[in-house]
């Protein structure tokens, strides 16, 4: 059975759950298509959330924001519990790893749900159709029809594939329609390039991908840049410290041209183009195929299997050279981290703040969702990390009225959000100033569309009322 969220679909093993799936979907999951971590579609909008363009794509009027039955926090909790019913599953979507999954993780993180790796733990796996359809199209041009973009390259936008393939199930960018269109694309891959489809299922989890990398040693992996897919026949040489990604040697380059270089010149070579090493982020569901596939394409077809394996052997016989590369990349990563002195917002610390949660914080997070407002207030100071205390304050401010909260906490958080919203600088979040500019830009874009203009006027009025609550904070 197949079920949907946003522009993706998830594989479910229980047909009896279909009715529940559809009923839940009808509540609206378009919030996962939003491109801002502070804005949520089809949710009960808090007074510090500002609607922007992604809502306009789905023609969502401001009335929906005011009348939705669930707050954002309530929907996150409900969604988390709902996903648990389908564990283990493949969480599949279109470009889902670039946005949707990261978005969902951050929603769990900010909602104090400690299981923010829900979609790739306890047997769950992440599966992204976009890189697979790109690779499939490279291998077999007839897999799926595409249109050319302005640069003359195949367009892999889901809306374009749906239009050209004549399988559009409705208005693109709505959650269920995009899901159904994604399923159609997945079918095309499975039917037209079954080897790609099977390979994609085998790399849907980091540990599965590592097993393939470690067993194959030499393999073909696809990368997509400058609007085109490219196969690389490569030799895995080590896992990056500290990022844990697979670092491979591109076997179009002969190792003997680099083995004798001193550290300084080797470092320059590693940072020059064309790249002699490839970084395979194997937690991103990459397409990893047999080496023989890449040998069908330039320039590897001219090098040949014997020379490819000879180059691989040379790398095996020179561990000191490999260690030098590893050391250089580790130093470069450290320098990059040290050069970035900008203090991240608490909302940005899902990785920077460390991946492990202390047992005490995890226990308090679980309690937070089960106790009343008094109990929640009592937990604020019990968290060992400031970011968790901050998230608790945010949730209390969003979920409870002013009269239910201590005056000091309400004022603290009200001023905090007022400072953010009234900023006139270019910020990472939506401000009143950035909203009004975007609203004016959309008015110009849709000047001949009365329906869009009416919705935009509604957004403008909605935000003007919101602004009044914060100007004197």
Over which residues does each language-model region extend?
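C-terminal non-catalytic accessory extensions
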Residues: 409-473
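Acidic catalytic cores of enzymes that act on phosphate-bearing nucleotides/polynucleotides
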Residues: 202-280
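Entry/capping segment at the start of metal-dependent catalytic domains
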Residues: 1-35
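A short, charged
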Residues: 267-307
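Metal-dependent phosphoesterase core characteristic of DEDDh/y 3'-5' exonuclease domains
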Residues: 21, 34-60, 83-194, 203, ...
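Conserved DEDDh/DEDDy metal-dependent 3′-5′ exonuclease domain
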Residues: 55-141, 295-364
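Substrate-recognition/cap regions that form aromatic- and gly/pro-loop-enriched pockets
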Residues: 321-430
